Swiss-Prot record:
Organism: Oryza sativa subsp. japonica
Organismal lineage: Eukaryota, Viridiplantae, Streptophyta, Embryophyta, Tracheophyta
Recorded superkingdom: Eukaryota
Protein name (database record): RNA pseudouridine synthase 1
Alphabetic keyword roster: Isomerase, RNA-binding
Coiled-coil portions: none
Length: 345
């Protein structure tokens, strides 16, 4: 049976681990990461004190072909993309709903700017992306219309003053907790792959001249295998949740046999803004996002091949950079979330 990750955790979380372990993963089609020569050299470098060793697995070799196919499809789709759904728009910014499988930059040319532009109506606004989403992630993005507003809002995102929530549909081990906060390191390994690192490695040098940086995410379980309750985003504080500090290698997600798997709907509250942060933490916790081939997610489930991962930028809350008023925006739920919620008892 696959062993759960070894973690530094709070006493209550330790008690939760004394419960009977969940069944191993099912025989769903999943791209398995084999040990790569690059990671062996990383381990050797770490042994000499040069580089830290990642605690999450490398990209599966077969994911390269899947990612290339998805990228080609997204490029064609982005080139033809002509109308971005607008959730909100005023003189200074627009909040749009990005579909999955479209690159962020396509939204700039697809934004149907209203008459509410700065200055002369004949002057085209200077559009900027205030935030970005991965190609296959759907949900809310903010587009600013002038340099001054762009600078203020980008700074707000960089300084983590924008509150964000995401929904993710995962396939893996059902967690024993309802809410949790996970803290780890984050960085690129020798061949450029984003990986999870131990918190004790934060600040250490990595190949390519970068360093391990800290990242933290709060998770809330909304449903497991059709049981649970979909609810509004929580405003919970740190002391209300269990806390995990990553120090050890993640569990091996491969398994044999006919064991069943769990379908898990989680809401993520990223506390930092690292690349692929939610995807990496879901992988480490043992329930990778469905369709996320880079990070151990199944590419086929219940007879269906998925062309992207099930991750959605659900909400954004921030102080308007011009009016100074607090604003909150919500995105309509994606079809995969509605389908799961409809099965919840």
């Amino acid at each position: 049976m696959t062993r759960l990750p070894l973690l530094l955790h709070s006493p209550r979380f330790a008690a939760a681990l004394t419960t009977p372990p969940p069944p191993p993963l099912p025989p769903a089609r999943r791209l398995v990461a084999a040990a790569a020569g690059g990671d062996l050299s990383l381990a050797m470098s770490a042994a000499t004190g040069e580089y830290p060793v990642p605690v999450s697995p490398p990209y599966p070799a077969a994911s390269k072909d899947v990612e290339l196919r998805r990228a080609m499809t997204a490029s064609a789709r982005s080139a033809a993309y002509s109308s971005a759904p607008v959730v909100f728009e005023d003189e200074w910014l627009a909040v749009v709903d990005k579909p999955a499988g479209v690159y962020c930059d396509a939204l700039l040319s697809a934004l149907p700017c209203s008459a509410a532009t700065l200055g002369d109506e004949a002057t085209k606004p200077n559009l900027h992306l205030a935030n970005r989403l991965d190609r296959d992630t759907s949900g809310l993005m903010v587009i600013t219309k002038c340099n001054k507003v762009a600078g203020k809002l980008v700074k707000a995102f960089t300084e983590h003053k924008v509150k964000k929530t995401y929904l993710a549909l995962c396939i893996g081990y059902p967690p024993a907790w309802e809410k949790i906060k996970i803290c780890s390191g984050h960085g690129r390994s020798k061949h450029g792959a984003w990986r999870v690192y131990a918190m004790s490695d934060v600040g250490r040098s990595l190949p390519g001249g970068s360093v391990v940086r800290d990242m933290s995410t709060r998770f809330e379980v909304l449903g497991i295998n059709g049981k649970g309750q979909f609810r509004e985003p929580s405003n919970f504080e740190v002391d209300e949740t269990e806390s995990i500090t990553v120090q050890e290698k993640a569990a091996d997600l491969t398994s044999d046999g006919d064991e069943k798997n769990s379908i898990i709907l989680v809401r993520a509250y990223p506390q930092s803004g690292r690349t692929h942060q939610i995807r990496l933490h879901c992988q480490y916790l043992g329930f990778p996002i469905r369709g996320d081939v880079k990070y151990s997610g199944v590419i086929e489930w219940n007879g269906v091949d998925y062309d992207g991962h099930a991750l959605h930028a659900e909400s954004l809350s921030f102080v308007h950079p011009v009016t100074g008023l607090p604003v909150t925006f919500r995105s309509p739920l994606p079809s995969w979330a509605n389908e799961f919620i409809s099965t919840m008892a």
